[in-house]
Curated annotation (Swiss-Prot):
GO terms for cellular component: cytoplasm; endopeptidase Clp complex. It is found in: Cytoplasm. Cleaves peptides in various proteins in a process that requires ATP hydrolysis. Has a chymotrypsin-like activity. Plays a major role in the degradation of misfolded proteins. Belongs to the peptidase S14 family. InterPro entries: ClpP, ClpP/crotonase-like_dom_sf, ClpP/TepA, ClpP_His_AS. It comes from Chlamydia muridarum (strain MoPn / Nigg). Gene3D superfamilies: 2-enoyl-CoA Hydratase, Chain A, domain 1. Its main location: cytoplasm. NCBIfam families: PRK12553.1. Fourteen ClpP subunits assemble into 2 heptameric rings which stack back to back to give a disk-like structure with a central cavity, resembling the structure of eukaryotic proteasomes. This is ATP-dependent Clp protease proteolytic subunit 1. The gene is clpP1. One of its GO terms (biological process) is protein quality control for misfolded or incompletely synthesized proteins.
Length: 192
């Protein structure tokens, strides 16, 4: 068996074992493709054992807001309680995903980092003034949605969150817990 084929088969075995233990690892940027994979896994677990807990482990630099909110909405729709665990990094939309679990179910590993900020538009935007105005209004609506998530999750005031996300705000796991983004630090997955 060629080495590449063997590694692919090994990855399939690992993925199967993780799904059997009701763990989903989201270890990549938030894209339409990564969101679709996460949603498929969530629904597979929901359909095979509705209401049974799921652990959603996040290590993501962030990415697409729309793709991230697609995952968020699915987690909120299923009956299975989801626990989020940040390991490594949850930045930007990754930090928003870490908050989709119910209060008391949001954790990080000791050396995890979380970064929150306001949304941005990448690349160059060109077009008519009215089109640019439409884009500007849309990003402000997106910013308001993200602020709402942080306010609800942390219990902080809207003013505190607006100030916090004005620029990139980096936090250790302990700092994120003090800010209200996390409910605890995990030293062992046996603690779940």
């Amino acid at each position: 068996m060629p080495e590449g084929e063997m590694m692919h088969k090994l990855q399939d075995i690992i993925d199967r074992k993780l799904l059997d233990s009701r763990r989903i690892f989201f270890s990549e940027p938030v894209t339409e493709k990564s969101a679709a994979e996460a949603i498929k896994k969530l629904w597979y677990l929901e359909l095979t054992s509705p209401g049974q807990p799921i652990v959603f482990v996040i290590n993501s630099p962030g990415g697409s807001v729309d793709a991230g909110f697609a995952v968020w909405d699915q987690i909120k729709m299923i009956s299975s309680p989801v626990t989020t665990v940040v390991t490594g990094l949850a930045a930007s939309m990754g930090s928003v995903l870490s908050l989709c679990a119910a209060p008391g179910r949001r954790f990080a590993t000791p050396h995890a980092r979380i970064m929150i900020h306001q949304p941005s538009i990448g690349g160059t935007i060109t077009g008519q003034a009215t089109d640019l105005d439409i884009h500007a209004r849309e990003i402000l609506k997106t910013k308001a949605r993200i602020i709402d998530v942080y306010v609800e999750a942390t219990g902080q005031s809207r003013e505190v969150i607006e100030k916090a996300i004005d620029r990139d705000m980096w936090m250790s796991a302990n700092e994120a817990m003090e800010f209200g983004l996390l409910d605890g630090i995990l030293f062992s997955f046996n603690d779940l």
